[in-house]
Structure formats: C-alpha cells, structure tokens
Amino acid sequence: MEIRKQYFKEKQYMWHKVRELQLKGLNKTQIGIYLGVNRKTVRRYLNMTMEEFVKKQSSHRKYRLKLENYEQYVRANLEEYPYISAARIHDWLKECYPDFPRVCNRTISGFVERVRKKYGIGKKVETHKRNYEKQPDTPYGEYAQADFGEKCMRTENGKSIKVYFFAIVLSRSRYKFIYFSRRPFDTGLAVYAHELAFEYFGGRPQKIIYDQDKVLIARANMGDLILTGKFQAFVKEQHFHPVFCHKADPESKGRVENVVKYVKTNFLTARIFQNVDRLNEEARLWLERTGNGKEYGTTHRIPLEEFAQEREYLVPYHGTPHSPGGEMKEYHVRKDNTVQYRGNYYSLPCGTYRGGETTVWLHETDGCLELYNKETGKLVCRHDLCELKGKTIYGEGHRRQRNIGAQKLAERILIYVSYNREVALWLENLQRRKERYYRENLEVILRIIPGYDKAILTEAVSVCLDKGIYNGESVKSLCGHIWKKKMRESDVGKNPASRTQSTGLVKTYNEIFRNNGKV
C-alpha cells in the first residue's frame, strides 16, 4: 500500500510539473527533455484534467498473464523435478507446444518463480530433520574415536602441498593425538599411526569407533564387515574391538569430527610447511599447550587433567611402533579409467579420468594393488594382483550400467499408462530395435507426459505400434494432433458433419510420420 501511495504522489507531481513548465512557455519537446520523459507522455498529461488523472490512477486494471495457460504444465514439471531451471522449462515448453508464444528469458524466469511461490515448490528438497539426544559420558578407558583428514599447506617458497593426518580422541577425557604424513594413509600407515597413538597414551582403550573407511575395511559383506588383512592382524594382536559407524553418518562420532575440524582451523591455518617431521613435532607441542592443554568447551575441563585419571583405565601398550616400508607411486589414469601396471590394466570407477593430467597414488601390498585419490588421499579401490599379462581387471561397480537408468524411465511411463499392454509391447520393441537411442526416445515421451492425459498417450503409441513406428518424436507429434482433434470435437459438439473422417485422420498420421522421416 505504501508503495502504491508513493507511486501516486510521483505521478501527481509529474502532472503538476508538466503544467507548470507549460505556463513558463516551454513546448512539449522541451518539457519532455527537462523531465526525462517522452513528448507523448507530456501531451497525455496536458490533455488530462485533474479529475481524469485521479480517476485513472484509482482504477486498477487486472491483466491476464500471457503464459497462464501453461501454468499446470510448469507446475507438474516442477513438482517432479524441483531442481530444474527456468531455462530448461522454457525449452520444454517450446518443444511440447509448437505454438508457444515468443517471450524473453526474464518473462519465463518470473513466471516459473511465480508458480514456485504459488504452489510452494522450492528448488531444494527439504531433508529429513534428525532428532538429537545428549549421550551420557562413557566410562574411563572404554571408548575412543578415530578418523582421517587432509588439508593444503603453503611451503616457504609459496608452493601448495597437501598433507594427510590421523586423529584419535579418548571419548571420556577428550585427550587427543594426531599424526601427519605426506602420502595418503594405507592400511600399513594407519596401523603405524595407531601404534604411535597407543605409545603416546601409554595404553589403549577397549573400543575404537571408525567410519567405514576402505583403508580399514576390505568388504562390507552385507553388514558382516571384513577387515583388511593388516588391520585384522593388528586388532587381534592388540585385543581391542573396532566399532564401525553406518555409512555416510559422521555425526555418530562427532568428537573426532570436531578434532579434525579443530586441527584444520586452529593448528594448520596459516602454518608454513617445512617437512613432515617438523610438522609432527609442532603438532606435539600444539597438543600440549592447546589441543589437550586448554579447557574443553562442553565439559569445562582440561583434557590433560582428565587424562591423568583415564590413563589408569587404559590397557597397557608394550609394543614398539614400526614404520611401514614401501612408498606410494604416482600413476597416470588412462582415458578409459584404467591404470597400467606390470603389463595389466586395473580399472577405476567410471568418471575418475578428468583429463590428461589425472593421476592416482598406487601402492602394492600383500598381493593387492591399492589405488588412492590424489586430491583427497582416500582409497578408491583395491584389486588382487594378476600374475598374467595383457589382462584388464575390473572392480565391482566400475563398469557403466547402461540399461538401469533407461529401465527406470520406462517404468515411469508404464506407471503413467497403468501398464497398458500395447504401450509395454511398443517399449519392448523400441528397446530391441533402437538400443543405442532407447533412453533418448524415453526422455522425449516423459517430457510430454505432463501435457497430455494417459488416454491420448496410449492412443498415440497404439497408432505407432500398428504402423511399426518406433520413434519418440512421432509419438509426441501424434499426441499433439490427437489433443487438437479432441478440442475441435468438444467445440463442435455432436455435429456429425464437422467431425474429421477416418480417412482424413489416417492421411494426417501419414503426414506426421513423413515429416519425421518414418514413412
């Protein structure tokens, strides 16, 4: 309302100013230049009395939206694909409606945004909110949490390098230990970091909580986790119980997640890297004065003082840490997502190759080949070494599944037409005859679904099946023709003389197929 009043005041000022300048002897062109408006606007103000001006400003014309007829189509697509952009909607509208009016991009964006607000369709799907509960403190010496991290640092000459680290925290006292490495953690290096931590603590806890990290787990095995050989041997030797969180659930070990974040933001930020031994020494000093020496935020206790009590409950560690031998080597990833090693090709997940400079870390251990991501240091995959030559060894899930996505699209079409037998047969024939273009044809049909009911789509597919036509564009064209035909029939009512004859309909179908190059 305030905006409307301000707008009226500005117009009223303009009306009075135009007349004031006219009385001073200025013509329409001069008034327009002075006020920055067109001379036609000046003429309109001069020809309008005060009563006419007030009446015009008081009347509110309601304009019909140019794209109003397409609101339900846009709504249906936004509800199914809430992440879709206005530009993509514009393209679909032009594709499904040949007579779609020419409008600018801003008009489309505004219309799509209006539909989103009207029906409450956000761009991001709301995620499920998790309920939290504060857990009681665990007994001394029972639990610890461990995790891995990495961060880029600057050297003295300004070069950027990445360092990797292992972090472990005792759950009760919050007493921490960190160990840095210049290479990603494999199983051997992870075991060595555990041994250093046990030596630092002077003992070990009964249980340690981890992510389901490939460095420690060989296979998930439907919940019966199978540990890597070296880590399994280490667990048996030290007699502690490893506890693994659910996949993608880092919040179940929040204490060590906070430690990793604390190391990155407090210890590593703005620190110059000299060498890894110096970095580990600096980390020990930082733990003494800050990481373990300052009061913990939630317990309001100092971890170093709490650890004096927890140390008595730890199982004594009498071993000697042994540094693992064998350095990782950097290997180039081929464009077919494989690495060549000793005359064989070992696969990586589809999409690993990102250009000619893509590399991974390679490490051979215990008859296995481990490949690590160069950027994150995470274990990408593990292969058994092949003694033959010239073989390609594929990992589970590394080969592209070509038909799974298309099958899901076909299922959506069948659900829409209530599993009509003719549509199912047409889709089956389409897949057999045009396997390479099967998905593209399905996508065309899915895009027209919001614009036509299932009866129209079923009729169009039935005609194509009868004529042996297997092309999504032909189905789309037929749907448009059938829809227009039904609209004409609804307009003329039941007048037999105005109905399209069947021979004319067949001729129209043939013209559609000919235009698509199918007859």
UniProtKB/Swiss-Prot annotation:
Domain Integrase catalytic: 135-311
Entry's Gene Ontology molecular function annotations: DNA binding
Protein name: Transposase for insertion sequence element IS21-like
Family statement drawn from the similarity comment of this UniProt entry: Belongs to the transposase IS21/IS408/IS1162 family.
A GO BP annotation: DNA recombination
Keyword annotations of the record: DNA recombination, DNA-binding, Transposable element, Transposition
SUPFAM superfamilies linked: Ribonuclease H-like
Role of this protein: Involved in the transposition of the insertion sequence.
HTH IS21-type domain span: 13-78
Domain of life: Bacteria
Gene name of the encoded protein: tnpA
